[in-house]
Amino acid sequence: MRIGGLQKFSLLDYPGELSSIIFTQGCNFKCPYCHNPELVVPEIFRQPLDTEKVLRFLYRRRRKITAVVVTGGEPTLQEDLIDFLRLIKAMRFKVKLDTNGSNPEMLSRALYYQAVDYIAMDLKAPNELYQKLTRSKVKIADIMRSMEIIRLSGLPYEFRTTVAEDILFGDDLFRIRDLLKEGDRYYLQPCNYSTTLDDLARHRLKSPNLSSEESFQKFKDWAEQHRVLLQVRGE
């Protein structure tokens, strides 16, 4: 495992649980608002943390935390992810996996081996804007397949989208509804623009007040009609 960081304690990242967060190195997307560029750009990768030391740390935290969040970067790019998750599960922790949905095969393996308890998947944009926003070659079929795998898993899950003016907002944001289905839990979250992958983007990024926007109200009305639980984080 290439582990680029460790946050010892969080009350926010796993709903209802006290967790530690493990950040993996490497990502196949290059979203301009990404606030962890040191996990995305190989030229600025830090020396990876020793995996055995991370596991020993978690073992010592068994009475202080109840869960571990594995995020990135993009965790499903790690070839030994499943073995790592199973070692965490063996310590009786709940495991939350964050993913961009680009690797449905690895997601299926994680579920097959019962290595996760909660899945959070980022929805970056409506289908026609995916490659533009992520600045990467994206197979929309993989995104759709990952969403369906997650829905059928029987596990708690969420889909979420980062909102930033000039990048994804208004009617573009509303078109993400085409990816959602009845019963989905969907979060909109403001971008963290203190640090971003794209230095130029940082100077023009703004997190809009969604609740005051007409397009958000339209999205909210649609969600209620289609039984999608739509919530806003950070407001």
Model-derived features: positions:
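A C-terminal junction/extension of Radical SAM enzymes
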Residues: 215-235
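Conserved alpha-helical substructure of the radical SAM core
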Residues: 37-68
